[in-house]
Amino acid sequence: MKRTRFAYIAGLLVAFGVAGSATAQDNKLRLITWADYVPADVVAQFKKETGIDVEVTLSNNEEMISKLRATGGAGFDLAQPSQDRIVGPQQEFGIYKPMDLTKVKTELFIPSMLDATKKNTTLEGKVYGLPHIWGTDGLVVNTKLAKMTDYTDLCDAKYKGKTSMRLKRPTLLAFAFASGKDPFALYNDPKAYAALMDDVGKTIAACKGNIKFFWDNKDQLLNGARTGEIVGAMMWDTGGWKLNTENADIQYIAPKSGALGWIDTFALPAKGRNDAAAYAWINFNMRPDIAAKVAASAGNFTGSKGADALMDPKLKAQFAKSFSEEALKNVKWYPAVPPGIEDIEGKVLDRVKAAS
């Protein structure tokens, strides 16, 4: 992908510290994060440069919120929730504390991505999140075995028993957009949002005959796609590009109704004990050389300014093939989730799960 494409992405997002050695009692960072975001060589280099050990707990958005809620924000020094999952949980549970931006090397971030994330994670004038990894949800299709252009194609009768998706909120949102509605525009109207989610839930329940399985982890889906058991699925871009590297017939496609765009952040748990180590890790990770290593491990792009120049050319080419400029304009970036929205979605997902 050309560097101008990265600049273009940064422009779209607009519309939408402390380093060094630690004291003896502060030589450990307790990090809760996503799989593949903490490569061993990056941890080793951080330890060598700062003397700080990194204790990693792998998780996801729901588990992060649950763990931090259970402890009142204790147990970890740094968390990596998606940017849309910070303000709502903070309002409800008080599980985070504000960032001290004087301790962050903000010049290391893509300015527009930093501004967008700050905007979406600000509560009562205080910033709670900084951008790290970003990517999208869309369609992964074996183009030799199926033709799909939007999420609802996963329910086409000719692919009965050969498609997959997660039984999670992104699937509800994707099918809402595919129906021609904008679920994000209804976030502040719970009654209308509940009605839309109810309709979407019925659509997905009626589609269950097409679904081989609701995937729980990426390896489950990757293996199904490799064998041809799955011909089309809703999945993260990184999974699609990994499969494409193995089999050129498998493509990651930006759906007609729009890929869903997410940004995973850095956030400070309310009762973290080692903010100094957390800021050191943030600043270390946003260096272009380190960000490129993390990006290679995750298979996604980062908010680090200049890291794109060090990225794998193959990944850049895959991105360019998946996203025309029109498709980039059509990405639906997740806004902050207001309190109560996930309760509505949870009830719908339970009904889909129970449907025969």
Which residues are covered by each model-predicted region?
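Early extracytoplasmic/lumenal segment of secretory-pathway proteins
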Residues: 25-89
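A ligand-binding cleft/hinge motif common to bilobed small-molecule-binding domains
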Residues: 85-88, 234-249
